[in-house]
């Protein structure tokens, strides 16, 4: 629920962003100087397309904007490999940035890899083992596209969900207003399967070919090809992209094991890096993952006090398609929006 406090915070943030844009436009602030001081940040991208579509979700940037951001970073910061970021193997007098991509969509290979090659920029791509189970999509991407194409109401497991729109169109449960994406995230896998079946039966996927950029995943051969590129490192992102923090320890262990085994077999390389789906985890998960060989673990925000001194764990910042690049670099510098 949007409270007055959160609304006033958003208004103040928007005014600050407008002011920053004006300062950059008038030349009162130079964008190239924003990252001039020493610092470090891990950036998270997801999907790239031709136009920077934000109608489905907030996870896509245009390929042109991504290239401009990599160009800026290559000229005004130090882009480092994730392994070097973890080990501190970079010039501490510069602003160090590690680039990461989550989810393993095919558009990463089409749009991101050529840019990385052009600017000699390393990046880590965190993939699920969807290709190993012959899955055509990740459930969140399926839901985003299907919601756009599906009827106004849908019934799943005896619950009725109705579409509502603010920035994005979403399904909400009639009984309590909870978003369908949250039902899927926090429910057993059987609910996700029931959701997909209900949306498919409702004809939600009949025109999905027009939206392939937003759900198609990398095939095993494409993963193998990317892994052979010296700019690319492959990391793990779970088996089915479930929220590991809400699974039993054994279910979470299998999610990690299936993913790690598949990626290592496919690439012929060790996979020591793990990005937690949704950025959530528990301390038990951190220990379990470390025992499985994940020495580089990535959250979004730290969740526990001891995380700050845990050399196996780092925070990341998701890139925001709704703000200007000037405001994006200011946020990267501060580590928050």
Q: Predicted regions span which residues?
A:
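C-terminal active-site subregion of NodB/CE4 polysaccharide deacetylases
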Residues: 2-100, 107, 138, 142-144, ...
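Metal-dependent polysaccharide deacetylase catalytic core of the NodB/CE4 family, i.e.
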Residues: 48-49, 119-280, 311-314
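Short acidic, Gly/Ser-rich segments with clustered Asp/Glu that frequently serve as metal-coordination loops
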Residues: 103-110, 115
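Glycine-rich, phosphate-binding/catalytic loops in enzymes
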Residues: 115-118, 291-292
